């Protein structure tokens, strides 16, 4: 009986080692890039009905700034997965209406153009090995 109990406890403890670990940032970035590629390639109608978002400064804090812009687009299922993925990169909680200093305050662009610009920038970061 003691041997059985010891075996059960050992297997329970070792089970924690086999649990899934967080996805590496490089893999998460690659998946985000693939999602943006899918969005840009599968455009038959204007993305998000031609909704406009604030342009962002792509040189710093790109993930949170991109999420802050996209979070204000409602009723667009095409970018919901992208929003969730960006949320994983952003260390703080982003809510609709939040304003970042990283946005170019006077410039709004269509979501489709925003996604294309973001895709180009993220591909560049991936090539350079900058995953943060």
Swiss-Prot record:
One of its GO terms (molecular function) is cytokine activity. Keywords: Cytokine, Disulfide bond, Glycoprotein, Secreted, Signal. Disulfide bonds join 48-76, 64-90. It is found in: Secreted. One of its GO terms (cellular component) is extracellular space. GO terms for biological process: immune response; inflammatory response; positive regulation of immunoglobulin production. Glycans are attached at residues 38, 49, 57, 72. Residues 1-18 form the signal peptide. It comes from the Eukaryota. Cytokine that plays important roles in allergic inflammation and immune response to parasite infection. Synergizes with IL2 in regulating interferon-gamma synthesis. Stimulates B-cell proliferation, and activation of eosinophils, basophils, and mast cells. Plays an important role in controlling IL33 activity by modulating the production of transmembrane and soluble forms of interleukin-1 receptor-like 1/IL1RL1. Belongs to the IL-4/IL-13 family. Interacts with IL13RA2. This is Interleukin-13. It comes from Macaca mulatta. The gene is IL13.
């Amino acid at each position: 009986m003691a041997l059985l109990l010891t075996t059960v406890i050992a297997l329970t403890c070792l089970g924690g080692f086999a649990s899934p670990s967080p996805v590496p940032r490089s893999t998460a970035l690659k998946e985000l890039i693939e999602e943006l590629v899918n969005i840009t390639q599968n455009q038959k109608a204007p993305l998000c009905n031609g909704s406009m978002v604030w342009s962002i400064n792509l040189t710093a804090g790109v993930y949170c700034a991109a999420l802050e812009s996209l979070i204000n687009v409602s009723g667009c299922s095409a970018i919901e997965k992208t929003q969730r993925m960006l949320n994983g990169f952003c260390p703080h909680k982003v809510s609709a209406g939040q304003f970042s200093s990283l946005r170019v305050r006077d410039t709004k662009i269509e979501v489709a153009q925003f996604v294309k610009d973001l895709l180009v920038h993220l591909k560049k970061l991936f090539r350079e090995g900058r995953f943060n």
